């Protein structure tokens, strides 16, 4: 009888311990957002010139994606990445270029910035090309990725070197 009472007391105590604690938490659930809308002050066609590399080329602007959670609009920092790729590649080519833009809803590009996108994609200088740009917006944790509309930009890049090679006028090198 003593064993039965002890067993019953143990079961009652265990039940009391397990049912006395209520899980009190506020689960934050991502509910989506609105894709940013990208626009440009000028989409070209640009004729990019090296001697005007510090001049403004265009300003890209986009809307806030308003990432939503079940607790309301996100107050977390949003990371914006400007992506550029050759036209028709659907941002999947190995020459895709990205530039991080922290917590801002616009980016002013100089001629040299725009030319850099063309050059890094290994597009021939002196020939008109079309590239596509979009904004990738994500929360600081990498969650909630939203992409903007695609903007086509046309331009003719110039040849630019970090160090001028031998035989160019800038290096004043005589190879003959």
Placement of each model-derived feature along the sequence:
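C-terminal motif of bacterial Sec signal peptides marking the signal peptidase cleavage site
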Residues: 17-20
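Alpha-helical transmembrane segments
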Residues: 11-15
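Bacterial N-terminal signal peptides that target proteins for export
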Residues: 1-9
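Acidic/polar, low-complexity intrinsically disordered N-terminal segments immediately downstream
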Residues: 4, 23-132, 136-174
